[in-house]
């Protein structure tokens, strides 16, 4: 007989259906409402079990903390309580006090305390001071250096003459002293009312035009080098908004001093001549100082002799505008007539041949003769082209065209 302690094993009943058929049939046989209710109940049970476990863990942690506190109260003679405050400070870690962040940088090995932002005197340094500066000066010096460089570049662009200390002295003329000083101040230059030769704030540039002898002597005797410039340099800097090189606009004060001394001795040498007085002096036959000195280089005159000391302006103008001084190529008949007239004049006045040399163009083309009709046609076409593009009487080109005699 089987004992009471032994458990009866249930007999396996044969499944009348195929494998999986009974399971599928059982699922289909259960309605959908019952399945949904069973799943929701299982989820609620899981949540309840998790909350119970969490509460139990919290209770155990609180019990452990209470036990630790009770032990410390029961044992008042703790060796740690008798330690010095310095040892307690050493037991703390910096990582527990100062939390890392993106604004705090780690201290490098080569860090020196002189680079600190909040560093006080070295004698008052506390070895247990945990509030060491976390940002060295190297990081801030770079940013400050970048800011200063950018500000300097902006000032140079706006005020290119910021480093210039100028003194302006302009007399009567085409330049205005007020306009030049205003342009210098707009460009950032400091304008001085007088020449300051001190080393603290000396004058670096002197804008001069028709200045006095005293200022020129001061500039030439100054120990500090001063750049003397004309007002055109200021106009160039103002138009370009840039510090233009002074080499093209330099002024030598010694040369100006020499001219000033000459002007005081004989003022007529430097004063410009009046055009009306100039023409009267040339047309006046009694005044022949210029023509007496250069009589050897003059061309022969038609109505004059080289021995005479007087000069007739009308004869000179008639000679320059005569047919002998016409420009371009001349035909054969005209050239022969002109050569005949010149030969007759030379025979009548043989002394002129020895004293005055002939023109070079007459010597070059005296032996030239037209032999064929083709050359004649070429000359005629050239003459037509010349007449089409003939310069005016008062044109400067007329003086440069060479004379050709055939």
From Swiss-Prot:
Biased composition (Low complexity): 35-45
Region annotated Disordered, chain positions: 1-88
Cellular component GO terms, alphabetical: cytoplasm; cytosol; nucleus
Compositionally biased residues, Basic residues: 12-27
Cytoplasm as UniProt keyword: yes
Chief location of this protein within or outside the cell: cytoplasm
Domain BRCT: 156-251
Key words, A-Z: Cytoplasm, Meiosis
Protein name: Meiotically up-regulated gene 176 protein
Organism: Schizosaccharomyces pombe (strain 972 / ATCC 24843) (Fission yeast)
């Amino acid at each position: 007989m089987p004992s009471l302690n032994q458990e009866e094993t249930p007999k396996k009943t044969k499944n009348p259906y195929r494998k999986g058929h009974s399971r599928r049939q059982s699922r289909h046989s259960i309605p959908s409402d019952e399945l949904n209710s069973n799943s929701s109940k299982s989820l609620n049970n899981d949540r309840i079990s998790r909350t119970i476990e969490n509460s139990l863990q919290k209770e155990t942690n609180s019990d452990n903390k209470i036990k630790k506190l009770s032990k410390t109260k029961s044992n008042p003679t703790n060796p740690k309580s008798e330690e010095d405050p310095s040892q307690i400070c050493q037991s703390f870690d910096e990582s527990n006090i100062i939390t890392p962040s993106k604004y705090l940088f780690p201290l490098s090995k080569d860090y020196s305390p002189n680079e600190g932002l909040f560093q006080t005197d070295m004698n008052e340094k506390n070895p247990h001071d945990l509030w060491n500066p976390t940002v060295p000066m190297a990081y801030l010096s770079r940013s400050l250096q970048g800011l200063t460089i950018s500000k300097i570049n902006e000032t140079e662009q706006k005020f290119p003459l910021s480093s210039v200390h100028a003194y302006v002295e302009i007399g009567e003329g085409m330049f205005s002293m007020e306009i030049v000083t205003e342009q210098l101040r707009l460009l950032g230059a400091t304008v001085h009312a007088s020449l300051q030769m001190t080393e603290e704030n000396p004058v670096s540039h002197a804008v001069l035009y028709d200045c006095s002898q005293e200022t020129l002597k001061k500039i030439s005797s100054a120990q500090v080098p001063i750049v003397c410039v004309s007002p055109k340099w200021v106009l160039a800097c103002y138009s370009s908004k840039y510090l233009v090189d002074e080499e093209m606009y330099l002024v030598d004060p010694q040369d100006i001093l020499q001219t000033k001394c000459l002007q005081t001795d004989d003022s007529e040498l430097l004063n410009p001549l009046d055009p009306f007085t100039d023409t009267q002096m040339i047309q006046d036959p009694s005044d022949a100082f210029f023509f007496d000195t250069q009589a050897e280089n003059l061309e022969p005159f038609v109505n004059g002799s080289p021995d005479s000391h007087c000069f007739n302006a009308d004869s000179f103008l008639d000679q320059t505008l005569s047919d002998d001084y016409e420009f371009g190529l001349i035909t054969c008949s005209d050239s022969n007539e002109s050569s005949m007239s010149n030969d007759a004049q030379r025979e009548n006045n043989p002394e002129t041949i020895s004293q005055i040399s002939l023109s070079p163009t007459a010597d070059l083309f005296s032996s030239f003769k037209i032999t064929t009709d083709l050359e004649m046609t070429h000359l005629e076409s050239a003459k037509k082209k010349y007449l089409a593009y003939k310069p005016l009487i008062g044109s400067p080109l007329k003086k440069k065209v060479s004379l050709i005699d055939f």
